[in-house]
Amino acid sequence: MGEQVLVVPREILFCNESTAFQGFREENAHPYLRMIAESSLFLPRDDVEEDPNYKQIIPYAVVSHAPPAGSERWFLMRRKKGGGEKRLHNLYSLGVGGHINPVDDHIDDGIVERALLRELEEELSVPREREVNPIGLLND
């Protein structure tokens, strides 16, 4: 069996397209996090990768650092050539993210945050005790 990823049926997430959008939307993510907790399930990634009926939930973090006496700095990462997704090889990312898998524990209100903290720890060695602040939603 292949990789399992967290998905939500598109019709539930976007109320039969009445709330659908494309790109980034700065808004309160908490209603969507509740919807994810109540309506998500794990399915094989190969089955949903090209299926428009399911939205894969992929937490993504943009990381900044504001030193006490300096200007804010932003994390930028160049993807390795040997990474999993060939379309991303040698490209730059402004943040870090990844699919939510069953390893991220049970499905509840905190699953998206736990998965994001796991990803930050894996990619950047950031301790999981950090605070994350949702600033919006990205739909692609």
Where are these regions (language model features)?
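Active-site segment of metal-dependent pyrophosphate-handling enzymes
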Residues: 1-11, 41, 45-48, 53, ...
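Extreme N-terminus nucleophile/cap motif
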Residues: 1-34
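Short N-terminal helix-initiation segments at or just after the protein's N-terminus
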Residues: 1-7, 33-42, 89-100
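Generic structural motif
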Residues: 11-13, 66-67, 99, 103
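Acidic, metal-coordinating catalytic segment for phosphate/diphosphate chemistry
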Residues: 21-71, 79-84
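Conserved Nudix-box catalytic region and its N-terminal flanking loop in Nudix hydrolases
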Residues: 72-118, 122
